[in-house]
Amino acid sequence: MKRYTLLRTFMLFMPVLIHCGWVSAHAQSAMLKGVKALGQTVYFEPDTTSVLKNPLTGWVMYLGRAWDENFWQTHHYDAMPVNGGDSTVRVSDYAGTCYIRINWNMLESKEGDYVWNDPDSRIYKLLASVRERGMRLAFRSNVDSRDQGQNTPLYVKEAGAKGFQDPNNPQIWSPYPDDAVFQQKYEKFLQAFAVAFDDPDKVDFIDAYGLGKWGEAHGVKYNNYSNKVEVFEWITDTYAKAFKRVPLVINYHRLVGDTISWAEPHPDSKRLLERAIAKGYTIRHDAFGMTGYYEQWEKDFARAYRFRLPIIMEGGWITGAHHRYWIDPSGKYRQGHSEDVRWGEYEESRNAHVNMMDLRIGDEVASWFNSSFDLVKRFEREGGYRLYPTEVSFVNKARSGERVSVQHNWRNLGWGYCPTNIPQWKGKYKVCIALMDANHNIVKKQLADEADLSTWVQGRDGHYTTTVNLDGLQKGNYTWLIGLVDTTKACQPGLKMAVDKNLLFEGWCKVGKLKINN
């Protein structure tokens, strides 16, 4: 009776306390709802140097048809000189993704004989070497053979597909993408490809067009040009039906699907790209830093999808080969100075708020590390998405069965965003509050469903209050944890946070202590 009287007296005086400002807004809400108010706040400083290797963010290195088992050593990828050669690093210590430019013929030269199933094949060993170095895969499969080798397996031609010879090499054949036999065979291949590689643990993205010159979605040669839109719908439908879990990307080229490679933007291009995006595609571009090719149309298209889709960057100039990059209209690139191009690519990537940048291969990757290593580290620090909790408020004493509040604020240090809004991810990454017992067992998890990671962009932090029910917990000492979990994997940590490594436990960030009394 005495306890009831005291509680009744306190509730009678609550309006007075609130009116006088003696109770915080959060405490007011907590007391009125039966949730225990906060007791302690911890502030976090971000880790701005560690390479996190989260999905769909960070550096991408390239591999292609020239790979062999000695590649990592002979091309110095396992010991790449930096800063003029005063030390070396592994390229894979900075690249989280390895993008493999490959062709259909290399993957299935004989119908139904898929090279990724053959442990003795060069491609199988290539893929294994990438995974051994802690990188995810990405793919573009080319079918057009012009300027390259035989990219489509000849069994397609033998089955009756119509096509054309490379004018510069009549021994090389390519199929018309509007040919029914080609489409039937390619659909079968892509379905098998997806069975093996529609796995986000192994694959970061699929460059899901692959038609035209170099697979870049321009210079497409049809049997009948009137089939252009029909072919675009067919290829994007085929990829979207095959790949459900791995993000698909397409080059936002001003002449996407057209027969020419450069001109004023085609009136169809924006509409076609929007059709692909509606099917779940995200976007990339293959000419960053080429200011005569990456112009206002491209900038406007990227701006329209800023923080709505992740943007993947590829530089356009090949600085160590035949490209005369010093004639770029910007006038900023000096002959013999690859580092000028690297800076131009970096600036344009920052302006576009890209999530991923390319190291590519050859002189590109060598110059990124040798003369522009500061930019490699800078992008890790300020590009893509880089998430961490700025502060967490929690109770440090409670009773079993009580409901307590945890207040948590989040920040993205990167100029990009965490694309939990794309259909392949379906919001699978969430904030989670957890409790760990004295034996390091996770005994309680509570998702912060209201927290949308895709809304955390520079200048717009996330602020949330999550209620945790302590029902079922025994008397004892516990540790508050917070993390970014993968809800498709029993809410285990799925994204790495930019916090001090000393605060981490199996991907969770340790926040503070909680003592539970019965």
Please provide the spans of the model-predicted regions.
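Conserved, mostly hydrophobic/aromatic
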Residues: 98, 193, 206, 239, ...
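Catalytic-core regions of glycoside hydrolase
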Residues: 32-82, 94, 131, 207-215, ...
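Bacterial Sec-dependent N-terminal signal peptides
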Residues: 1-29
